[in-house]
Amino acid sequence: MRSHLARNATTTTPNVYRRLHAAVGHHHGLLRPCSATALSARRCLFDCQHDVAHIPRDVALCTRTSKRTFISLFTPKPERFVKLPHFDPGYNVLLQYRKSEVEQERPPPRDQLVTAFKKLTKFKADTNRPLNPNQAFLLRTVLHYLLVTKPEADAPVDLKMSDLENAMDAALLPPKGSPEFHLALARLLHEEIMRRRLILLNPEERKVHLTKDDFARYIKALTQYGGSLEAAGRVKEFWQQLKDERSAVYFRGSGRIWIMVLEGLANEGREEELLQFWEEAQETGGIKYIPGVHQIFVTYYARQDKIEETKQWYSKPIHSGFSPTGETLLELVRSSRRSSQKWNEWLLPVFEQVVQDKFAKKGSLDAFLQWSVLALDKGPDGIKTYLQTMASGDFYQSHEVKVDATTINRLMQAAQEKGNPYMAERFWQLAQDFNIKANVHTYLNQMSYRLDANDIEGAHQIFSKLASGAVEVEFDEDLPVMNKYLRVLCAQQEPNIQHILTITSALEQRHAVLEPETIVALCLVFLNHDKKFDVIDTLSLHSVSISHIERQQIYKAFVDYICSPQTTTDRAWDAYSLLRQYFPETSVDDRVRLMESFFERKKPDMACLVFGHMRAHDDDNMHPTADIYVRCLEGLGRCPIPEQRPSDPASSLKMVHNMLKMDTRVEMNTRLYNALMLAYAAGGDPFTALDFWEEHITRSAEGPSYNSLAIVFWCCELIPLGDRYARPVWQKMLRMDLEVPQLGLTYNALPDPVSKDEFAAWAKEEYPEEWARLESKGQKETEFQGPVFNITRLFEA
């Protein structure tokens, strides 16, 4: 093994992790070797096993400018350390396995993989944090490897049934991104669980086995992740199997399986299959029209704003005389917000019936209160009467009916939906009249509506209470509001950077992963305030913990920032350096856009570096095509580098030309030679440009194009006695009856005032109207060529 490959195989770095994440998303796991610019012999940024203060040349543009006073010369500032990323337990081992698999190296030891699998799935299940798509993909890949490779004969069973069940619990936590890999993981887990259970059971025990929750969990995965049609077929097959084995009587809780499929079909918008499966559920499974089923059908039609169907399913008698659930009524309230008039006319008697029911449930009454705020425009004074009735206990018989923090929270949410933060604050004051103690959701609602009102100080007061432990926060339920808080702070005209860093530090201690929109907001505000190390910290901490879709969202924002005319060139280049370091999966189209943005900034040297990084990328799919070579050379033709001569071996043009010579995937054609002529002529070397014309274009089977002719005449303008080169070409054009260039371009190309006067006299006589229009554009004087018309001359390859 070559030395640098051996070192990379034994040294796991965050840079490798970022590339692994990029590979899992962009290539569905087809990891490419690291580029020499992103991970080289100089070592990558933030080496976990070495001093993190050693930053490579790749990010030298991100270092701070040294500023010292006289006294500080003797008391140097402490060195700034880059924050290392936090990995979920076991995740780094899974990444190492994927790297070894793609690069065909020896994988980590089996016991390490088993331990990593157990740690990650147990951590996710215990903390209620969903797997992101990358983690689900890697878990599925490692599990497949562990199942197809056998452990040593004397080794204990490495993955126990409880480990597989933990993994299934983790897979069932709904992710933010695509659930494709979660479903694949759940399938493999279910197959292995079923295999292990059946292989250990005799026929009599198998009947008891069928009462287990394995099948229900698998159906939940299917219905949750878009496989409801398959789930419907599985349920019918499973039920028939139970009947054939006379085991249906042992299977308790079968109703929830049928209901899960109904809910999945409704969520996927499959109306025909939903109605058909409902008929089968009644006939085969004996499912009744219970409140849960009532909620599924009413919610399905209400979300589609089909009021007649909603009325029909709502009015159907519920089994055993039960009342609709509170969630059903809440969905009707949401529908009334979309088209209030026709819904409220129907909902008025519906909620009157709810309020007058002595046995009404608390959820139904809370829904009524929300509807009163949203539809009837009731304020705190009007709601107070209802709350007093609920709190008295004289009318409603259910012991659950009481005024608590949940009631106030829903009223505050209704006020927020109306865009009235002042009303939401009054509802909180109303809660104090009833001696209601705030819970975590109360504080989060307060923080949210204060942010909506741009009350930064008020939101900070709530943040301080949460940070001091006024209430216990479980399962990161405060993260959505904290992300919103950070985004609002970043959007201020003069952001308080220190305040932002205080919040991010508090979240970092919890190892919380921010939303991609928040990461973008933080990075941009830090870039705009030249806080480059804070950008590095933000990307280092979060870029390895998010899915490839979220990574794409972040790098797209970086590309937009770099290409924005409002961004200074220095900041744009700093942002590009970080983009290249942390997001090697940046698409070719975006890289071309970056290259052209630097050409537009009149920074061709930077544009050529972007092109060079594309050419040096280890992923062949990222290499420039012939069209991209042309666009780069055209850019050099528009804005050459004044201090560089094309013949200089270190020039940007020479670098691009050498890359083209060495690129075996690109076949030379007239368009490429045209682009080379443009670049060399613009760079001050028209003779080399004419060599391409004489030695390649005129002798090729493809021959010159109209653009070739325009470019070669321009080259002739740039050299002494250029008419000697131009006349033979011109004569050939006349013989072939080709289209003659416009009058203005021809006039401007003539080398001296005498020739221009002769041409003008001829043009006035032959084309009087065209010449008059040309004269209306005006002229300007040049030092050697005399007057020229004010027309823009653009060349394309």
From Swiss-Prot:
Protein name (database record): Complex I intermediate-associated protein 84, mitochondrial
PANTHER family: PENTATRICOPEPTIDE REPEAT-CONTAINING PROTEIN 4, MITOCHONDRIAL-RELATED (PTHR47938:SF35), RESPIRATORY COMPLEX I CHAPERONE (CIA84), PUTATIVE (AFU_ORTHOLOGUE AFUA_2G06020)-RELATED (PTHR47938)
Localization annotation: Mitochondrion
Gene Ontology MF terms in the entry: mRNA binding
GO CC term, one of those recorded: mitochondrion
Any GO BP: mitochondrial gene expression
Organelle transit peptide: 1-69
